C-alpha cells in the first residue's frame, strides 16, 4: 500500500475509534496497518544506517 494511503487509513481508523468505536474487523485492520507502517519505517531506518560511514576523528592533544 502507498505510504500516504496507509497513513490516511490509520488516521481514519484512529478518529473513528475515538468517535464511535471500531468493529472487530476494523480493530484487526488497524493493528495490521500499524504493523505494516512500523515495518516500513524500520526498513527505511535500517537502509539509512547501512549507508552511514564512520569517519575517524584525528587524535587531538589538549
UniProtKB/Swiss-Prot annotation:
Similarity comment: family membership: Belongs to the UPF0291 family.
The domain of life for this entry's organism is: Bacteria
* Protein name (database record): UPF0291 protein CLK_1994
Spell out the disulfide connections.
none
Assigned keywords, A-Z: Cytoplasm
InterPro entries, sorted: DUF896 (IPR009242)
Q: Which Gene3D superfamilies match?
A: Helix hairpin bin
UniProt key word Cytoplasm: yes
HAMAP family to which the protein is assigned, alphabetical? UPF0291
Q: Which GO terms describe its cellular component?
A: cytoplasm
Instruction: Give a yes or no for keyword Nucleotide-binding in this entry.
Output: no
Pfam families under this entry?
DUF896 (PF05979)
Instruction: List where in the cell it is found.
Output: Cytoplasm
**Organism name:** Clostridium botulinum (strain Loch Maree / Type A3)
Upper classification of the organism: Bacteria, Bacillati, Bacillota, Clostridia, Eubacteriales
Amino acid at each position: 500500500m502507498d505510504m500516504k494511503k496507509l497513513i490516511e487509513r490509520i488516521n481514519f481508523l484512529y478518529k473513528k475509534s475515538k468517535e464511535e468505536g471500531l468493529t472487530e474487523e476494523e480493530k484487526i485492520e488497524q493493528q495490521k496497518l500499524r504493523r505494516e507502517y512500523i515495518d516500513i519505517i524500520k526498513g527505511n531506518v535500517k537502509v539509512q544506517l547501512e549507508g552511514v560511514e564512520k569517519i575517524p576523528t584525528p587524535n587531538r592533544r589538549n
